[in-house]
């Protein structure tokens, strides 16, 4: 359920979120979290790493979130650098997808910029990810909705044009089902900025399809992601 936070003491947020996640993960289950500010991923990663060890991070975003800081900030722009320095995530086995803002240092993360994705296509993205992340690596997915182009997700705090479409994002997500998925979060949805609620629909669909991937790994049938079609059913229908 929801994490109870005392907004008068923001310095306690990391421990409060981490402790709440611990109580769920200790039951041997998986966690899908929704935010909120992207910083929430940091305590979630801390909790998951207690069980799974160093993590391969698959990070959908317009921003790298690896800016240098003084080590004391609670900030959504630097938490992945902190996670890497603490050994929570392994940059060399992690991939950042959809980046289209400037950061002069990768800090070892593998980056797929949005323009590259547009020119090479989803299949090349999937190949790149599987060359970096191996089936046995514990994989955590974090999806900042501003990875999507504002045409598909206007309801977010820091939109950047030139992003992925929902079709591209879902195509990449669906390819990750053969990896060792340990958890996911979907963050930075701001419904007040989107009266048509297409951002919320995109986030809900991404979360739904992630759960379908988990269910499929547990032995469910093809109908989980979509009905399995006979070859005769694929393509245009003659009237």
Where are these regions (language model features)?
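Conserved alpha-helical scaffold segments that buttress catalytic/binding sites
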Residues: 1-239
